[in-house]
Amino acid sequence: MEKFSNIAQLKDSGLKVTGPRLKILDLFETHAEEHLSAEDVYRILLEEGVEIGVATIYRVLTQFEQAGILQRHHFETGKAVYELDKGDHHDHIVCVKCGEVTEFHNPEIEALQDKIAEENGYRIVDHALYMYGVCSDCQAKGKR
């Protein structure tokens, strides 16, 4: 996403355009396929020569989540990770050895969840499915 689009996105979300917000949003655009913790954001920004305090990063991540720019997840690692909210629904498979996260969407799983909810008198308004296993790389390395 281009810088003017990020400025518009911040304004449309009701957030003031600041240097730290733009840098953090740019970072998530650049790492759009990754799930980043606050510590990851801090480390990557430092590597790029950008110094933003950890407290500011946590505050911006929370603001972005509340504004619908980011989604927060809590995988087995115990720490929150964030990804851009692209407006599409997907689920996650997480490697318990290396932490790799794979996103997937399966219509059969979605239909089964709807069926189970209906059978129990529910209408699903939202859900999150996290599956945990050992990725092929870790299996090949014998980390079972």
Curated annotation (Swiss-Prot):
For the keyword Repeat, the answer is no
Q: Which Pfam families match?
A: FUR
Return one Gene Ontology term, BP aspect.
negative regulation of DNA-templated transcription
Gene Ontology MF annotations: DNA-binding transcription factor activity; transcription cis-regulatory region binding; zinc ion binding
Q: Does the keyword RNA-binding apply?
A: no
Which sites bind Zn(2+)? Answer: H35, E83, H92, C95, C98, E103
Q: Which UniProt keywords apply?
A: Cytoplasm, DNA-binding, Iron, Metal-binding, Repressor, Transcription, Transcription regulation, Zinc
Q: Where in the cell is it found?
A: Cytoplasm
- So where does Fe cation get bound? H89, D91, E110, H127
Query: Region entry DNA-binding: which residue ranges?
Result: 1-86
Record-linked Gene3D superfamilies: 3.30.1490.190, Winged helix-like DNA-binding domain superfamily/Winged helix DNA-binding domain
> Could you tell me which residues belong to the region Dimerization?
87-144
Q: Mind naming one GO cellular-component term on file for this protein? A: cytosol
S-S bonds: none
Supply the PANTHER family for this chain. FERRIC UPTAKE REGULATION PROTEIN (PTHR33202:SF2), ZINC UPTAKE REGULATION PROTEIN (PTHR33202)
- Report quaternary structure and partners: Homodimer.
Q: Which family does it belong to?
A: Belongs to the Fur family.
Q: What does this protein do?
A: Acts as a global negative controlling element, employing Fe(2+) as a cofactor to bind the operator of the repressed genes. Regulates the expression of the fbp protein.
Q: What's the name of the protein?
A: Ferric uptake regulation protein
Q: What is the lineage of its organism?
A: Bacteria, Pseudomonadati, Pseudomonadota, Betaproteobacteria, Neisseriales
- Which gene is this protein's source? fur
